[in-house]
């Protein structure tokens, strides 16, 4: 059995409610099991970006399309165009009824360069969601 260490994490009440719903819906035995699973997936998805090798992948970002965010994303596109193979964009309405922009990048190149690009995306103000998938 794996040696497990206990830590403490604080969440807003609304997020705990959502976590509890996922635990019940997906059949997890506890919040801890769900959170361990989520952290494990995060580490696995991001770990290939720490190696210095050629990889391919997809980066998804959903954000509030403010002037500042649109300008920042445009700047990032030009700064990192050597790893961007294609880009698909759409304006959508979120489940909360807010307007958002979705950008899906297909990327290929040195994992360190892709990591730098993704780290900049993570800093976008008004970001609703982001994800990187490396294969």
From Swiss-Prot:
<dbReference type="Pfam" id="PF08753">
    <property type="entry name" value="NikR_C"/>
</dbReference>
<dbReference type="Pfam" id="PF01402">
    <property type="entry name" value="RHH_1"/>
</dbReference>
<comment type="similarity">
    <text>Belongs to the transcriptional regulatory CopG/NikR family.</text>
</comment>
<protein>
    <recommendedName>
        <fullName>Uncharacterized transcriptional regulator MJ0767</fullName>
    </recommendedName>
</protein>
<dbReference type="InterPro" id="IPR045865">
    <property type="entry name" value="ACT-like_dom_sf"/>
</dbReference>
<dbReference type="InterPro" id="IPR002145">
    <property type="entry name" value="CopG"/>
</dbReference>
<dbReference type="InterPro" id="IPR013321">
    <property type="entry name" value="Arc_rbn_hlx_hlx"/>
</dbReference>
<dbReference type="InterPro" id="IPR027271">
    <property type="entry name" value="Acetolactate_synth/TF_NikR_C"/>
</dbReference>
<dbReference type="InterPro" id="IPR014864">
    <property type="entry name" value="TF_NikR_Ni-bd_C"/>
</dbReference>
<keyword id="KW-0805">Transcription regulation</keyword>
<dbReference type="InterPro" id="IPR010985">
    <property type="entry name" value="Ribbon_hlx_hlx"/>
</dbReference>
<dbReference type="GO" id="GO:0003677">
    <property type="term" value="F:DNA binding"/>
</dbReference>
<dbReference type="InterPro" id="IPR050192">
    <property type="entry name" value="CopG/NikR_regulator"/>
</dbReference>
<dbReference type="GO" id="GO:0006355">
    <property type="term" value="P:regulation of DNA-templated transcription"/>
</dbReference>
<keyword id="KW-0804">Transcription</keyword>
<keyword id="KW-0238">DNA-binding</keyword>
């Amino acid at each position: 059995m794996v040696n497990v260490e206990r830590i403490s994490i604080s969440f807003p009440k609304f997020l705990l409610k959502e976590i509890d719903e996922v635990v019940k819906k997906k059949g997890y035995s506890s919040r801890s099991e769900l959170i361990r699973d989520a952290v494990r997936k995060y580490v696995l998805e991001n770990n290939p970006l720490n190696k210095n090798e050629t990889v391919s992948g997809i980066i998804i970002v959903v954000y509030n399309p403010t002037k500042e965010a649109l300008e920042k994303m445009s700047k990032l596109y030009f700064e990192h165009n050597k790893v961007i193979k294609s880009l698909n964009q759409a304006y959508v309405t979120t489940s909360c009824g807010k307007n958002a922009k979705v950008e899906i990048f297909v990327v290929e190149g040195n994992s360190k360069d892709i990591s730098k690009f993704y780290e900049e995306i993570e800093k976008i103000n008004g970001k609703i969601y982001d994800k990187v998938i490396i294969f």
